[in-house]
Amino acid sequence: MSAPAGPLGKVIRISELSGEASSLILLRRVAAVDRHGVLDDKSELALLQWAEKSRLGQSPELIQRVAQRRTRALAELRALGHTVIRLRAEPEWRLAVGLGNRANPHEIGMSLHGTYGWPIIPGSSLKGLTAAWAAQVSEPGSGAVIRIFGSTDKRGSVRFLDAIPAGEPATVVLDVLTPHHQPYYTSTAPKSGGAPRPPAEHHNPVPVHFLTVTGAFALDLTGRVTNEVRQAAEWLIDAGDELGAGAKTTSGYGYLKVSRLGDEERHG
């Protein structure tokens, strides 16, 4: 549709974003501003609503193809002598991964696949989560922990691949926080420079919108030392349940039910 806009009444064309639009462009490159060049909160919310409605452009057919491609790639690794363990993870509620990835105009944080723009759990996050749990349950300076995760001098023996949607699109959920005492939090933040303002009931809540996901993800671990890949998988299963992945785990986000798939350990 068309509508008059601007001080001269110029006509602008308004159309709904396609569900096939690139989420990498929309969430990482687009800056929605008003006629004064100021970032527009309403347009930012519209981008987030598009992400929820379109599921970040996830195509069931393409997801199936990517899953098949990964299966073939893992089969090649097995043929080369690698051990491969395949896991399936499902959030107990919602998952907030990549909220700190705010290198975009509207500071929308979410981990996205670098090619397709789908939600993922980065392999680096899975490795860090597993290493944190391993450190809790192992002796200090454990040789197994050092071998599996590496050190400053040597890389680890197990590779944690990015977790991708497990055969079907993940559900994208637009969530919201409502901090009630923003002046207090702002004035007491490091380097605020001003006098602290006490929290008070007359402070208005300030809604903060962010994206979360739910649904099954495929987790894959590979390595040449079978026992070490198995150990990493066991630690990851426990870490997902005990520590949770991503942000806001103290609020119930990120806890994962991780299970092993039936035919995962064939290797050459």
Spans of features found by a protein language model:
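Basic, Gly/Ser/Thr-rich N-terminal segments that form RNA-phosphate-binding interfaces in CRISPR RAMP
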Residues: 1-268
